[in-house]
Amino acid sequence: MTESEQFKQIVCTMYDTFCKKNHDYGNSFSTTWQEFGSLGLVTAVAQISHKYHRLLNLTKGTQPKVDESIRDTLLDLSNYCILTVMELDKEKAEGRF
């Protein structure tokens, strides 16, 4: 598998996870962003920070209470970053950012 194919496969996995979580939880990321108005970006940073700290704990060998690997955490972190970019793009399109 080439690097491009591997990259595409990982992004497809992230997209699949995004769709499944949106089905289960609704569009909670966007809803939370909207609820906090001008602090939407702060809420996103808080969620990203939570994942970052989970990643730090996993790299230190701390046993997680939930079955989440370093790979899973990195994929979640990537998805949160993409969701943040999507919200920023919406705000820019609406002239708010």
PLM feature segments, named:
Residues 1-97:
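Intrinsically disordered, low-complexity regulatory regions
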